[in-house]
Amino acid sequence: MAKVCFVPGSGTLAAYLSGEIDHHAAQSIRREIDAQVDDRLPELLTLDFSGVTFMDSSGVGLILGRGRHISALGGRLT
């Protein structure tokens, strides 16, 4: 099971992911990240995958989608 922990900063939002990211987990994480981004509108979104033990192609989709989402709001992804 995947988890995400958020650390907001001044104009930034860091999301620390851990566990296994598969199709089912990616959907839940996507909703959590988007809700935080929409609420906080950070200039910079950082996704930290150092705690992830497994990731399939849905994790790649998660990254690409969050990049498009933050870009549409005028921010950037690292």
Residue positions per predicted region:
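Amphipathic alpha-helical interaction surfaces in cytosolic regulatory modules
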Residues: 23-78
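STAS-typified acidic loop motif
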Residues: 2-31, 50-51
